[in-house]
């Protein structure tokens, strides 16, 4: 089993954690219905970029 030889510094710990931050989902408002949805995804009622694509 690998065991560290020296205690990692606070700086190294912070550098390792630098990529762990969470980001909020980017939302868009549909042109046709005014509904909020995830970017590059269709809305719940089937619109994408102002066009009806499903149903």
Swiss-Prot record:
Region (Disordered): 1-28
MF-aspect GO terms: structural constituent of ribosome
InterPro entries xrefs: Ribosomal_bL32, Ribosomal_bL32_bact, Ribosomal_zn-bd
Cited Pfam families: Ribosomal_L32p
GO biological process per UniProt: translation
Keywords assigned: Ribonucleoprotein, Ribosomal protein
GO cellular component: large ribosomal subunit
Family: Belongs to the bacterial ribosomal protein bL32 family.
Name by which UniProt lists this protein: Large ribosomal subunit protein bL32
GN (gene name): rpmF
């Amino acid at each position: 089993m690998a065991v560290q030889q020296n205690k990692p510094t606070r700086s190294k710990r912070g550098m390792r954690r630098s990529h762990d931050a969470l980001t909020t989902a980017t939302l868009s408002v549909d042109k046709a219905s005014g509904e909020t949805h995830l970017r590059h995804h269709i809305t719940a009622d089937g619109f994408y970029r102002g066009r009806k694509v499903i149903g």
